Amino acid sequence: MSEAPILKDTTRSTGREALQKNIQAAMALAEAIRSTLGPKGLDKLLIDDEGRTLVTNDGVTVLETAKVEHPVAKMMINTSSTQDRIAKDGTTSTVILAGEMLQNAWQLILQGIHPSTIARGYRKSEQYLLQCISEIKFDSDDKMKSSVVKTSLAGKGHSSMQETIARISLDAVQMVAGIDSTIDISKIKLVSQTGGKVEDSKVFRGL
């Protein structure tokens, strides 16, 4: 007596074919948001099942709104969400960089290099990059810090709000910054009130 198949109307991929399909899924996701990258990035018009629309060029918003079933694509979205939770920026760059790394890894696999060897190479590259960052870092003034904050705010609201948000954000961070410049963002509490303007926002110590 033969056993009934558990998964009907499905196909199974193994080996190099499965690896290629996984990389293709990651690359497709990266390509979907590539045009949103940078200060001149394009907006995406998102429409949900109920017909509601959202215009944004925020990478993590686009990815989390998309209905993706592929497990590797979901991993890429989770990576972007983690980047957003920790750094609050760089979500699009994270996905694009991961996609390019996978694409380059695939080219090396086609040349006969084992995936574990490629993974070791990426880990060594990470160590080298961290060393380079330590060597080229420099102190920044308030003007440069403000510019960095404004850049991260691009596409997240009207440009007229950026000056105010950048100023109060820097003030809040400087209030909680430790002696070694470490910052515990849990010490910053946001309290919002209905009505008024963004320009009315203020920073208070000790609440």
Spans of features found by a protein language model:
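Glycine/serine-rich anion-binding loops at beta->alpha junctions
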Residues: 13, 83-93
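Short, solvent-exposed positions on alpha-helices
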Residues: 92-93, 116-120, 163
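Glycine-rich oxoanion-binding loops at beta->alpha junctions
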Residues: 50-84
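Hydrophobic or amphipathic alpha-helical targeting/insertion segments
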Residues: 102-143
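Elongated alpha-helical scaffolds
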Residues: 74-77, 89-103
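Extended amphipathic alpha-helical scaffolds
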Residues: 1-55, 60, 126-207
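Short glycine/serine- and small hydrophobic-enriched flexible loop segments
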Residues: 31, 78-82, 100-107
